[in-house]
UniProtKB/Swiss-Prot annotation:
Protein name as annotated: Flagellin D
Residue pairs linked by disulfide bridges in the UniProt entry: none
A cellular component annotation (GO) from this entry: bacterial-type flagellum
Family membership noted in the UniProt record: Belongs to the bacterial flagellin family.
Function: Flagellin is the subunit protein which polymerizes to form the filaments of bacterial flagella.
Keywords noted in UniProt: Bacterial flagellum, Secreted
Length: 395
């Protein structure tokens, strides 16, 4: 039926044109944004996943920056520690040279002093962004952390993982408060036994007694009171920095050190004692730290072998600490590479979920433009129906 009031053909053409225009708007939005899921209304599930993963990627980007900062700190400490190893090697070489008869120990000590100052300079300068891992207050171990990763578990709980490095007596060159660093702590290199001159009732005789380091006694439960101590039921006295087992009682005058039979008993004439006025018959190695090496000192000059062993122990600690820093540096480098690849993988995964296929969208846009032109022509034709009816009345 033909009607001048209702143009059904025009209405159908207009409805088709509106649908095409709507599809064109969506396609143009995808082409311009590059996304097929740009809002939650496009696909709520994919949009939610993509938004969460983009947030995680931002956190991983921050982790990458933190890893770079951490790597700089570790590399700075490693460079300082590596240099310190070489300096301590030089000190050991100087001590070995000092064992030669006829050498000028004072001149060698001058060189050692310069090397010791270089160690101090290294420890002070090895700082990055206010962080110095080569000198610290070792009242208690200090844990330094480098951000390593950002993790979201299966339940959606997020956490930041760190790479830790402990600053203690085995990893720090100098203790800023006490003497517990590698270079300022005392390395006990005492022999297992020492021969002493013992004055018993005015009769001097030699006795070989057990020698102990301070650490050994502490481990045995010793409680030190002045220059004598009791550990495990055995009495000890301190002779030139080394604790030895007391073996004889004496009422002779001039006794410099003594150990009592019990921790609570007072020192009396009947106490166990060692007379050190004459000195030991065999030399007692004097423990020393690298910081306090002075071969012009008679006690140290007489025990160069012990000093060399002490320096060698410190060198082993330095090498171990340097190795630990190198391992952490390697791990940080690996983590940086992993985080970079992980970020790329997440970006790729997000793209698969929400990115538009530009070839497909471009083809669809061309098709819709053609459909739009045809729909416009169809609407134009439908609108001419009323004119055709008027032509009938004109005839």
């Amino acid at each position: 039926m033909t009607s001048i009031l209702t143009n059904v053909a025009a209405m159908a053409a207009l409805q088709t044109l509106r649908g095409i225009d709507s599809n064109m708007e969506e396609t143009q939005a995808r082409v311009s944004s590059g996304l097929r899921v740009g809002t939650a209304s496009d696909n709520a599930a994919y949009w939610s996943i993509a938004t969460t993963m983009r947030s995680d990627n931002m956190a991983l980007s921050a982790v990458q920056d933190a890893l770079g900062l951490g790597a700089a700190k570790v590399d700075t400490a490693y460079a300082g520690m590596e240099n310190a190893v070489e300096v301590v090697k030089e000190i050991r070489a100087k001590l070995v040279a000092a064992t030669e008869d006829g050498v000028d120990k004072a001149k060698i000590q001058e060189e050692i002093e310069q090397l010791k100052q270089q160690l101090t300079s290294i420890a002070t300068a090895a700082s990055f962004s206010g962080e110095n891992w080569l000198q610290a207050d070792l009242t208690a171990p200090v844990t330094k952390s480098v951000v390593g990763s950002f993790v979201r578990d299966s339940s959606g709980v997020v956490s930041v993982k760190t790479i830790d490095y402990v600053l203690d007596g085995n990893s720090v060159l100098f203790d800023t408060v006490g003497n517990n660093g590698i270079l300022d702590k005392v390395y006990d290199v005492s022999e297992s036994s020492v021969t002493l001159s013992i004055n018993t009732g005015g009769v001097v005789s030699e006795h070989t007694v057990a020698a102990y380091t301070v650490d050994d006694l502490i481990a045995g439960g010793a409680v030190f009171q002045g220059n004598y101590a009791l550990a495990g039921g055995v009495n000890y006295v301190k002779v030139e920095g080394v604790w030895v087992e007391a073996v004889a009682s004496s009422g002779a005058p001039g006794q410099e050190v003594a150990a009592v039979t019990t921790a609570a008993a007072p020192i009396t004439a009947d106490s166990w004692a060692v007379d050190t006025t004459a000195g030991p018959a065999a030399s007692v190695p004097a423990p020393a730290s690298i910081e306090n090496i002075d071969i012009t000192n008679a006690a140290q000059a007489a025990n160069l072998d012990a000093l060399i062993r002490g320096v060698d122990e410190a060198l082993e600690d330095l090498i171990s600490a340097t190795s630990a820093l190198g391992s952490i540096s390697m791990r940080i480098g690996m983590q940086e590479e992993f985080v970079s690849k992980l970020t790329d993988s997440i970006d790729s995964g997000i793209g698969r979920l929400v990115d538009a296929d530009m070839n497909e969208e471009s083809t669809r846009l061309k098709a819709l433009q053609t459909q739009q032109q045809l729909a416009i022509q169809s609407l134009s034709i439908a609108n001419t129906n009323s004119e055709n009816i008027l032509q009938l009345f004109r005839q």
